[in-house]
Amino acid sequence: MQIESKTNTNIRSGLTLIAPFFLWGTAMVAMKGVLADTTPFFVATVRLIPAGILVLLWAMGQKRPQPQNWQGWGWIILFALVDGTLFQGFLAQGLERTGAGLGSVIIDSQPIAVALLSSWLFKEVIGGIGWLGLLLGVGGISLIGLPDEWFYQLWHLQGLSINWSGSALGSSGELWMLLASLSMAVGTVLIPFVSRRVDPVVATGWHMIIGGLPLLAIALVQDSEPWQNIDLWGWGNLAYATVFGSAIAYGIFFYLASKGNLTSLSSLTFLTPIFALSFSNLILEEQLSSLQWLGVAFTLVSIYLINQREQLKIQLRDIWSLVRKPVIND
């Protein structure tokens, strides 16, 4: 009986650990499902503002402190514009033009940019494993985002015929997703500065609300009634992306982070695009080319190498010390 109870506890802990990544991945699919009936900026607005209200209500219930000075509010506003307005705005624009699974892979490549920014701003050491991950990441994103024809022309030693008009790179969903990923990376770098002055959960709630307001204004300028064509299924998709994909996912993530599971969480980042790819294929029947699948594989390996570079370095050092250990004959 005790063994069974321990097994159930381990299963619940494991499910809780992967829950945020499952919710974030499937939320991308839910957002994609409603974009045909409304504008990208309205979807981004609904993803942010109601979720921010829910997070703040929970924070109030936990008696977490509100911002106390204008310096704290200043950091929240900056965080909101970068990680709220720009990130969700670019994401929704990109999602309208590309698949949910592919978009999620590009979005979750942001540890690549975070590593470079941290190296530049905080003098963090990337190391050999990190640089290998960065190279794989750049290659993976190139395979995902650039036209397949470019690579086939290079393979056959032909000159590149680049078309920047129409549906080419300049207006591609992959480019918007890359901008979203860069915005998220800058937002990630801002988090330590925000957390020093404001409770992180409270900052998350306010940044969702403040970041959503410019998106709401743009959505209403584009269409005075952007909700009029959304059916019951579409509202269900939006509710899922808002409640589960934002409020609950962030709540679980912060709960796990407060318990000291940051290493486990960072090592599971690659699960978000895997869930998004799986459900976009299952529900939306999205298909990728062979080169794009290769790019997905490169990018996922890159995310793992960058997030786990310190742990991998220790493991490789231990293996090397065992290999070099002299054999003592009796």
UniProtKB/Swiss-Prot annotation:
It comes from the Bacteria. It is a multi-pass membrane protein. SUPFAM superfamilies: Multidrug resistance efflux transporter EmrE. InterPro entries: AA-Vitamin_Transporters, EamA_dom. It is found in: Cell membrane. Signal peptide: none annotated. Gene3D superfamilies: 1.10.3730.20. The chain crosses the membrane at residues 15-35, 41-61, 72-92, 102-122, 125-145, 175-195, 201-221, 238-258, 264-284, 286-306. Keywords: Cell membrane, Membrane, Repeat, Transmembrane, Transmembrane helix, Transport. It holds the Pfam family EamA. GO terms for cellular component: plasma membrane. Residues 22-146, 182-308 form the EamA domain. Its main location: membrane. Belongs to the EamA transporter family. This is Uncharacterized transporter sll0355.
